[in-house]
């Protein structure tokens, strides 16, 4: 599966709840396109998930759900490696080595930790604090060239680049010079950032207590229509220019979803609906969502009834990841001087 002529892409999704439209447009849809021209590893990052407490039964179920969605959305196990992070122990081993490379000051600057910890900083897990080091290990273990990232992960990838450079410098006299390639970000289009259906200023999230805030893969057609019909909007007609969207976050969100699903430019969608009321637009958006989600939902139903197949795909991905990571960890341990 590994092809040295192709650039290596690594990315992952946390199994922390029901995946939704935001995960699809913001990540998984891009994964499907990337596998055609890249050497892709798509991980279910369960070690990242437990930096915040997870119900063990739910975690096991969610892992299989993410695997199902990867496949149902179009990730091809013949073109990409799909595996569970914790089944490849070298992720944790390399994370510890990188813990010893990373400077405390670097971690202190990570804004996502500050946001997630909030005022309860003294009581959150140390795993949440060192989360970026594990992310760096995920990426560097496979000598990744490209990492798809959104706004919330850009800083972590910058840290990964710093860690890789420091490792190369620290061990330059011991075979480590230029050992890790410095991974580049694959910046996702802003239009792929999907916001809550109830508040256009907040990201669509699994953790939002309101199920009406998101479109989930297992929503039936009637529920999709209901969620879109009740999605928050403003009383004005749809605008005619992108500049008009700056102060209309809910309109911007729904139009951007339409743009991403249809493959049309946002300005073209605006031209089609300029001056119209939201009622007709919401009907058309619902139809478009159903056309995209229904085939995935039907495939999910089939996969849910074939857990043996899912486990075989994950085992195949784990074997590929182990083969590759065994080689890299042997070299890393030799460079560092570990037994």
Which ranges hold each PLM region?
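N-terminal Rossmann-like or analogous alpha/beta NTP/dinucleotide-binding catalytic cores
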Residues: 2-10, 15-137, 301
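Short, solvent-exposed beta-strand edge segments and adjacent coil->beta transition regions
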Residues: 16, 144, 210-212
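Conserved nucleotide- and phosphate/pyrophosphate-binding catalytic cores
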Residues: 23, 161-339
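Short helix-capping/linker segments at secondary-structure and domain boundaries
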Residues: 104-108, 141-148, 259-269, 297
């Amino acid at each position: 599966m590994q092809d040295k002529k192709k650039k290596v892409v690594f990315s992952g999704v946390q199994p922390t709840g029901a995946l939704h439209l935001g995960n699809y447009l913001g990540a998984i849809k891009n994964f499907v396109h990337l596998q055609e021209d890249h050497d892709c590893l798509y991980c279910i990052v369960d070690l990242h998930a437990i930096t915040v407490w997870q119900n063990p039964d739910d975690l096991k179920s969610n892992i299989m759900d993410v695997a199902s969605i990867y496949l149902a959305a179009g990730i091809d196990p013949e073109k990409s490696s799909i595996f569970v992070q914790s089944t490849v122990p070298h992720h944790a081993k390399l994370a510890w080595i990188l813990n010893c490379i990373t400077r405390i000051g670097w971690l202190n600057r990570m804004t996502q930790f500050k946001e997630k910890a909030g005022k309860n900083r003294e009581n959150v897990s140390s795993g949440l604090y060192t989360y970026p080091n594990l992310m760096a290990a995920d990426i560097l273990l496979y000598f990744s060239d490209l990492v798809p990232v959104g706004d919330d992960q850009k800083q972590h990838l910058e840290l990964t680049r710093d860690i890789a450079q420091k490792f190369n410098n620290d061990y330059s006299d011991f075979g480590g010079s230029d050992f890790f390639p410095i991974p580049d970000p694959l910046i996702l289009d802003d239009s792929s950032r999907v916001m809550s259906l109830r508040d256009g200023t907040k990201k669509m999230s699994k953790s939002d207590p309101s199920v009406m805030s998101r479109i989930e893969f297992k929503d039936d057609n009637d529920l999709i229509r209901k969620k879109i019909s009740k999605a928050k909007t403003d009383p004005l007609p749809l605008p005619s220019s992108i500049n008009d969207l700056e102060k209309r976050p809910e309109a911007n969100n729904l139009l951007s979803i339409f743009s991403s699903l249809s493959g049309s430019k946002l300005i073209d969608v605006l031209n089609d609906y300029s001056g119209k009321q939201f009622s007709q637009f919401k009907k058309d958006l619902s139809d478009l969502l159903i056309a995209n989600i229904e085939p995935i939902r039907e495939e999910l139903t089939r996969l849910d009834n074939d857990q043996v197949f899912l486990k075989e795909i994950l085992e195949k991905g784990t074997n590929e990841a182990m083969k590759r990571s065994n080689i890299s960890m042997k070299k890393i341990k030799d460079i560092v001087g570990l037994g």
